[in-house]
């Protein structure tokens, strides 16, 4: 996508955010954002994982659309962590994570590499923080069982980054869905964009793109099918 098209879709400021998130110059991005980043009136947020999505989406919208304050950021990649911290005026913890670092925050956003989502979530729940877990919440059943146990033990809130049901197009479709007793079939054809052979998504230990991305569409399918009076007895997933 060229810059001109990006500006049409996202606007100038968000496009600038995406560019900075890719090249990561030492740029005090917070100076041009609308939000007063030194505010202490809102939620205090910790950010785990400082990749492009965290930089151009999570940190951006927390800084422009809420009164939250990003207190700290950490990533195993020192450049990713330091560049996001510099851009958004947060404390850079680098990869030296200690559970005590969560004592100053209300909620932690977890958008690190996929295999680490579960353990980070468990650690912060046990520390008494609400957590927002980007998809996937777990990469295998063992992790899911551990996370489920931690959620049941904790009285803190857990949010999950399956956002497709909240898209404007799905809301339009739902408004047009009148009769919930009529049977219907839902089919999704998904074509993933190209990623290089050495991309970390392809590492089997990270859950692969099936766990990482297909979960979005399974979640959306269940949501749409729930509009009917009964849920289906099974889902059939074909990987070609």
Where are these regions (language model features)?
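Beta-loop-alpha module in the N-terminal Rossmann-like domain of NAD(P)-dependent dehydrogenases
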Residues: 88-132, 136-147
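Short, well-ordered alpha-helical microsegments
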Residues: 55, 81, 117-118, 140-141, ...
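Acidic (Asp/Glu)-rich catalytic clusters
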Residues: 62-63, 126, 149-154
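Conserved acidic residues
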Residues: 71, 106, 184
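N-terminal Rossmann-like dinucleotide-binding module
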Residues: 7-88
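A contiguous active-site-proximal alpha/beta segment in oxidoreductase catalytic domains
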Residues: 138-198
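Rossmann-like dinucleotide-binding domain that binds NAD(P)(H)
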Residues: 197-240
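Conserved small/polar residues in nucleotide/adenosyl-binding loops
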Residues: 1-6
């Amino acid at each position: 996508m060229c810059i001109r098209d990006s500006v049409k879709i996202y606007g100038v400021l968000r496009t600038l955010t995406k560019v900075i998130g890719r090249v990561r110059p030492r740029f005090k991005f917070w100076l041009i954002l609308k939000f007063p980043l030194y505010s202490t009136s809102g939620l205090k947020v910790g950010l785990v994982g400082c990749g492009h999505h965290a930089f151009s989406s999570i940190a951006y919208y927390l800084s422009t659309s809420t009164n939250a304050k990003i207190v700290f950021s950490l990533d195993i990649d020192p450049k990713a962590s330091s560049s996001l911290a510099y851009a958004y005026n947060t404390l850079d913890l680098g990869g030296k994570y200690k559970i005590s670092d969560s004592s100053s925050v209300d909620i932690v956003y977890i958008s690190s590499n996929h295999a680490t989502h579960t353990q980070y979530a468990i650690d912060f729940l046990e520390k008494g923080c609400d957590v927002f877990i980007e998809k996937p919440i777990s990469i295998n059943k063992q992790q899911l069982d551990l996370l489920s146990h931690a959620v049941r033990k904790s009285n803190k809130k857990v949010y999950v980054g399956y956002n497709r049901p909240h898209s404007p197009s799905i809301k339009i479709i739902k408004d047009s869905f009148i009769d919930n007793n009529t049977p219907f079939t839902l089919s999704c054809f998904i074509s993933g964009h190209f990623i290089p052979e050495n991309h970390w998504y392809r590492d089997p230990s990270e859950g692969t793109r099936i766990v990482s991305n297909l979960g979005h569409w399974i979640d959306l399918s269940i949501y749409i099918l729930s509009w009917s009076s009964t849920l289906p007895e099974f889902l059939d997933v074909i990987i070609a």
